Amino acid sequence: MAMRDKIEHAIQNQPCTVKDLKSKFGGDRGSDRKVMEAVDQLVHEAVICQRQGVFFTVRSGRADKALLCKVVKLGKNFAFVMLEDGTSDIFIPGRFTRGAMPGDMVLVEKFEHPRVEGSDEGEILAILEEKNDLVGTARRIEGRLKFVPDDCPAISMQLMRDCEGGAKDGDKVAVEILQRGNRQEDHRVGVAMRFGSSDEAKRCAKALLYAQDIRSRFPDKVREEAKKLENAEVSEKDTEGRMDLRALPIFTIDSAETKDIDDAIILTKTPEGGFELGVHIADVSNYVKPGSELDNEAFNRATSVYYADQVVPMLPKQLSNGICSLNEGVLRLAFSCLMHLDKDGNLIDYRFVKSVIRSRVKGVYSEINALLAGSADDELKGKYHEVLSQLPAMKELYGHRARLRKERGCMDIESGEVKLILDEDGHCIDVKKRTSGESEAMIEEFMLLANQCAAHFARVKQIPFVYRVHEEPNAEKLERLHTLLQACGINDHFAKDVPTPKELSAILEGVRGGPYEQIINTGMLRCMSKAVYEEKPKGHYGLVLKDYAHFTSPIRRYPDLAIHRIMTAQLKGMDKDTMVLRYSDFAEKASKQSSEREIIAMQIERKAEDCYKAEYARRHLGECYEGRISGVTQRGLFIELDNGVEGFVPASSLTPSGTMLTEGIRLSDPVSGKNWSLGDTMMITIVRADVNLGKIDFEVAPASTK
């Protein structure tokens, strides 16, 4: 059979890439050339056509139906792909996955008649881009060291003997796919990085960072630029053209361990009883210039990543902890928002200026809380003697602002954050619910005011910008919230109408201190749309604000740095048309990149926290605790302990006779009549903890069996 006919026959059976065709019919330079000549001839004769590098027969019409997708989830016998625009996903049965891996870009054809009515199913026609870097665990299986990917722990791949990289059974590793097979299990891999034991949370966290290409070490060119600022100081020349505020008793308030200090404050009362609030933010844009290696790297990272006691900074420490950080007692360049508020806390006006400041003291939240509560000793009062007189006014202003937030219906959802306590070796030895006091709330409100002013400034000036946007919840999420509220005995209309934030706030206030408080807080958090960055102002649903942006953390967030750069140009007199030409594309790209990287950072932080919680739980296997049912599924119950650690109780361990799920809120045993409902308390025993996967299993303690 001629090469032309072979290729036509092959493509009739299955769409193929050039790589596929050369693999089947080529092998050397001569035969590869014949393959390409035959392909060119078939295209010229309009027998085959190309889509995204994949060849189809024209008669089949399949090219027009093919969809560009990304593999987002892989199971033992299935995969899910997401359309390129992120609008919907498609289920791929195992025999149609072609060995694709998460992260691969693929071409997919949907089935006309899916097995489940109303669902989207299809097959992968071709793999266009391969993601060959994977993270997982080395496991000895049937006498051979194999690789089990985190993305699909149900499968294992062959670790090539000469590419094991010193890995041992149970090690957390990163691998590269060296040879692909037709099934995922047929892929052959080699170790690219060994992190250490998968039973240590700190090793698993490092692997999570590696999987998303987040590196603690900065590229050489970035480090070279940063080194030039290693011992930098603010000179008198640097202060030219800036408002000189160094004589004012400005100070910072942060946690004791904070080294990258973005913001400082000062507050004075006016003779009329109003307030002059100054929020002074590190002028990072003065040091990170457009087009520099520092700026390119900051754009790529977009955010600092925080987990346990570690941080992977957006900027090198020479800037984040050095010349940009508003450290105590040294001159620093700042971007200041100077606000005037009336005696009731209403914002009257504001202005933005470039300034030079000297922070008087590095305030600590716990110490400020003690001063506000009147429980501080003389030594502590002495530390804050230069700024002590501001605290009563700050407390008063915060009281007014808290009242105004409540009046407009601003939501106050408890996030349920925890604090991980580590030993000197970095192992988690305790988990505690994170608490915050009055000073934390004060600083949050003052920063919110400055952020609001920045967004208002941009909208009034009609300049390109990066806004923080939070849209109202969608109908599907509201339906789930409605079901949850009904289960907790709370009547609402959310299944039909979008609630106002004020209505949601009223529900939160109504359950505060009760058994359903944490469950409903969590339910509302899950109901909310994800806040994102956009170049158009669309308001902030949760804060009930027309204008909002992120201005106050340019050391750790790129959107803040981006709008500093844009606002600086406007303050220097750049006209609107020039600003639109220069910054419109920049604002759009910064918004997109920052939104994407923020999601990745949040996922890493959440997964790392789960690993540390599991590490803590391993120390307490066999111990009993009281917990509350925080989630109900057909498979079993999620139980949250008082310290925020959550585990799973399989339905099979609840009763031997089987259970029945009622609207996602209750499991019932129809034989014995036992019920397990959201919000119920129960005694559990910790029976398993998988640090690698961040999963904890509980069993019902005998004394709590009902």
Language-model segments: residues:
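Charge-lined substrate channels and their catalytic hotspots, especially those that engage the 3′ end
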Residues: 1-278, 285-331, 369-372, 615, ...
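Electropositive polyanion-binding surfaces
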Residues: 23, 174, 179-180, 197, ...
